[in-house]
Amino acid sequence: MDTRADAEIKAMELIGIGVLPLAMKAIIELNVLEILSKAGPDTQLTAAQIVTDIPTTNPNAGFQLDRILRLLASHSVLSSSITKSGERVYGLTPMCKYFLPDQDGVSLAPMVVTIHDKVLLQSWHYLKDSVLKQGSLPFTEAFGMSPFEYSVSDTRFNKVFNAGMFDHSTLCMRDVLQRYKGFQGLGELVDVGGGTGGSLKMILSQYPNLKGINFDLPHVVADAPSFPGVKHIGGDMFESVPSGDAIFMKWILHDWDDGRCLTLLKNCWNALPEHGKVIIVEWILPSDAATDPTSRRVFTADLMMLAFSEGGKERTLGDYGALAKEAGFTTVKDFPCANGISVIEFHKK
């Protein structure tokens, strides 16, 4: 294929690339992957067979579903083949396991539904305003309020968002705990912005002698369940944070601009003992114009921050190091994990 023809095909594909994740969202909501999984390993089914397990009275359901599955198969999301009788059948690929509940009942599927929910999709129509108007947040342009304010007013979206974040956070923490051993030897760990304590629960399950403090806004920790070894404390992290041997923050700093991050890190510095440390988990922005899948994932995460978080952004390792040094920390250590995520330590001494 000549270069011009190849470029034209890629250009045409780009026009409709947004359809792919929406097709994925549809089969997740229809439980197609679960239906294929229950059929057994390496089993392939026709769309007509699949819809027998979907609650619908639509006589054209099989035909319509086949059109969705055909697109996903063309992107190798599903396997596909033609039987001797001429029927098209579909099965699971290795990729599909990440969208099926694992041994802990979590997967990437809820995040697909969250990111492509109609609420968040509406924000992208205002992405250009973040360039044209100073201080413009696409989400606020779309709804006239911040994402946090909106989630309070829309209980349906709040439930969808929380489900997506819970599963994604659990998967991330599982990888962190497999790769990072810096919780060893700590007596007390403070999780700043810890929500209802899910991350601390996972950490303490691996380090049972560790005591945990889950710190978040009062209305958040008010609904937090009780965990052995975990104390819930409400407050404002931009005012002060509880003291501990180490302070843990997962996907917190990327929500805020440099000024707010510096305020928070200084509060952490003040709360730590002489040899204490801050442990953060964040996406690490590549410092060059990389085109590999992991880098594209982080660039996508950064654009989501541009659309949904006022002042939020992904940062390079150097950016985080500069913030840490300005806040008073002397040493920065990086522990790369999977999919562009790193654990980074900021040491007080």
From Swiss-Prot:
Its practical application is: Combinatorially expression of Sinopodophyllum hexandrum (mayapple) genes of the podophyllotoxin pathway (e.g. DIR, PLR, SDH, CYP719A23, OMT3, CYP71CU1, OMT1, 2-ODD, CYP71BE54 and CYP82D61) in Nicotiana benthamiana (tobacco) results in the production of the chemotherapeutic compound etoposide.
SUPFAM superfamilies reported in the protein's UniProt record: S-adenosyl-L-methionine-dependent methyltransferases (SSF53335), Winged helix' DNA-binding domain (SSF46785)
Q: What InterPro entries does this protein map onto?
A: COMT-like, O_MeTrfase_dom, Plant_O-MeTrfase_dimerisation, SAM-dependent_MTases_sf, WH-like_DNA-bd_sf, WH_DNA-bd_sf
EC number(s) recorded for this UniProt protein:
2.1.1.330
Tell me what turns on expression of this protein. Answer: Transiently induced after wounding.
Q: What pathway does the annotation place this protein in?
A: Aromatic compound metabolism; phenylpropanoid biosynthesis
Kindly give the Pfam families that the UniProt entry links to this protein: Dimerisation (PF08100), Methyltransf_2 (PF00891)
Tissue expression, per UniProt?
Mostly expressed in stems, and, to a lower extent, in leaves.
Where does the chain bind S-adenosyl-L-homocysteine?
Answer: G193, D216, D236, M237, M249, K250
Q: Name one GO molecular function term.
A: S-adenosylmethionine-dependent methyltransferase activity
Keyword Transferase listed? yes
Q: What does this protein do?
A: O-methyltransferase involved in the biosynthesis of etoposide, a chemotherapeutic compound of the topoisomerase inhibitor family. Catalyzes the methylation of (-)-5'-demethylyatein to produce (-)-yatein.
Q: Which PANTHER family match?
A: O-METHYLTRANSFERASE
Assembly with partners or alone: Homodimer.
Give the family, as the similarity comment puts it: Belongs to the class I-like SAM-binding methyltransferase superfamily. Cation-independent O-methyltransferase family. COMT subfamily.
The protein in question is named Desmethyl-yatein O-methyltransferase
Species the sequence originates in: Sinopodophyllum hexandrum
Q: What is the lineage of its organism?
A: Eukaryota, Viridiplantae, Streptophyta, Embryophyta, Tracheophyta
